Design a protein with these regions (language model features):
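Short alpha-helical transmembrane segments in multi-pass integral membrane proteins
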Residues: 1-26, 84-149, 193-256, 313-378, ...
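Transmembrane helical elements of multi-pass membrane transporters/channels
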Residues: 24-44, 208-212, 216, 220, ...
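Transmembrane alpha-helix boundary and packing residues in multipass membrane permease domains
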Residues: 29, 33, 44-45, 63, ...
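Interfacial/gating helices of multi-pass transporter permease domains
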Residues: 47-67, 134-139, 198-203, 248-255, ...
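Small-residue-rich hydrophobic transmembrane alpha-helices
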Residues: 56-116, 153-172, 285-345, 349, ...
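Short runs within selected transmembrane alpha-helices of multi-pass transporters and secretion channels
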Residues: 70, 74, 141, 145-164, ...
């Protein structure tokens, strides 16, 4: 690690004294992100082997709705990590604990209607994309079985971001990685041993996600994990209360709402993209989803570096050190781009064998490999976007990143995808959309960070603002 730190410092990417705390926070989150993203990726591959294109196509449609759940949770948890890190960094632990309590209550209020919607309206939700009976059957079945996991996943995201905000990414890594392994094992048993198909994938996800909730809840109420090496939360949820602080709740909503909007703008884009892909047939639908899943695995790097940027920038601002906060943000962005370029290069080289893990026919492999390669290249834009937006989030500056997300995805990416209908671009319009949806918001958010307006925004959220 020391040699790597020294080499990166000589290359003027990141100083060694900032690299160490960054990676101490980031590497467990990267493992966590990879574990979380690998669940649906492994499920998609197993369904492809057991059921075929109809199964993967229907599951692709269902996973679009699951992505909305994830984006809602990430947006809300973005407000959590921003306020927890600033208050914890300013030694206001009781106030940070109250942020967590209110985040849990809000997450539950959001989750319950979504659970009911998945259970009651699964078939109409899938039919939005395609009326093919086989696709609708497989997609709606997955939604029904995965519905209870909606509540579990939102609570898990709040717990994970709480641990990140206080500088502990090891505890959530152990819980999340254990849940991911359990998910793969359960899904494999249900899909292959019990011949449950997509239902087995959904059931495996629900049971494993619930397991993670139980594990994290133990520490979130301040209980010790014994000799496991995991730590109880230093800002625990308590029964004694208080349960509500209107001023703090307003700040949580104020920071989270634009971040939820930014995340939803990112997640909702997949709906018209899949609708356009459906016009080219189930092979293209599956190829798009394979490309997105592989890109999401690469983007697990952002789970670590993006959250490290939020936490470290937030903690430095909580201590009223704006210069150090700026230095952390700038250098983490540079580090992210370097790592993403390296990871994307490897995936592009091995795009065809990677595609072969999900599909088997020659035409299917060629199409999926193209989307795997394009997805890998577009992931570099995610690296820029995630760390720049993460640094802004640590300061509580979430409104303009939300606008950047809208512009990139709805002004650039979707029109590019639609060009396939009216020009000879055909499927290449979807390739272009993959690239624009990450590089445009990434470039805008990096420019916003370089402007420095976020420093002024952060001053009204710091503990010193309350006492002042």
């Amino acid at each position: 690690m020391d040699r790597v730190a020294d080499a990166l410092e000589r290359l003027r990417i990141i100083s060694s004294e900032r690299f160490r705390p960054t990676m101490e926070l980031a590497w467990p989150r990267i493992v966590t992100g990879f574990a979380i993203m690998s669940k649906q990726t492994a499920d998609l591959a197993m369904v492809g082997m057991a059921v075929g294109i109809a199964g993967t196509g229907g599951m692709a449609f269902a996973l679009a709705y699951w992505e909305i759940v994830t984006m809602l949770g990430l947006g809300l948890a973005g407000g959590t990590v921003s306020l927890v890190s600033q208050n914890y960094g300013g030694e206001e632990t009781e106030r940070a604990s109250l942020v967590v309590t209110q985040s849990v209550l809000l997450a539950t209020a959001i989750a319950l209607p979504l659970v009911a919607t998945f259970l009651l309206f699964s078939e109409p939700l899938i039919a939005v994309f395609d009326s093919d009976p086989a696709l609708v059957e497989h997609g709606s079945t997955y939604l029904v079985y995965v519905a209870p996991a909606v509540l579990f996943e939102l609570l898990n995201l709040i717990a994970s971001r709480t641990y990140t905000g206080v500088g502990d990414t090891f505890t959530e890594m152990v819980a999340r990685a254990g849940g991911a392994v359990l998910n793969v094992v359960l899904s494999a048993v249900f899909i292959f041993a019990f011949d449950m198909g997509v239902a087995g994938a959904g059931l495996g996800t629900t049971l494993s996600t619930g397991f993670v909730t139980v594990v994290l809840a133990w520490g979130m109420v301040g209980r010790s994990y014994g000799r496991l090496g995991m730590e109880p939360s230093p800002v625990p949820i308590t029964r004694s209360g208080p349960w509500l602080d209107l001023g703090l709740a307003k700040q949580l909503v104020e920071i989270s709402a634009p971040e939820i909007g930014r995340r939803l703008a990112q997640g909702i884009t997949v709906f018209p993209l899949l609708w356009i892909a459906a016009a080219f047939g189930p092979v293209v639908v599956t190829a798009v989803e394979v490309g997105r899943r592989v890109r999401s695995l690469i983007n697990s790097i952002n789970w670590g570096l993006g959250l490290a940027a939020s936490s470290l920038v937030g903690q430095q601002l909580g201590a009223d050190d704006e210069d150090e906060a700026g230095a952390y943000g700038t250098e983490i962005v540079r580090l992210s781009v370097v790592i993403y370029v390296a990871a994307a290069s490897v995936v592009v080289v091995f795009a065809e064998p990677i595609a072969g893990l999900f599909v088997s026919g020659p035409e299917e492999v060629v199409q999926a490999a193209a989307f795997v390669a394009v997805g890998a290249i577009s992931a570099v834009g995610f690296g820029l976007d995630g760390t720049a937006a993460g640094a802004l989030l640590g300061a509580g500056d979430t409104r303009l990143p939300f606008v950047a997300s809208l512009v990139g995805r709805y002004v650039f990416a979707l029109p590019a995808a639609a060009l396939g209908f009216v020009t000879p671009l055909d499927v290449a319009g979807l390739y272009l959309a993959f690239l624009l949806e990450t590089y445009v918001p990434g470039g805008i958010n990096y420019w916003l960070f370089r402007r420095g307006r976020w420093k002024a925004v952060s001053r009204k959220y710091r503990p010193s603002a309350e006492s002042g």
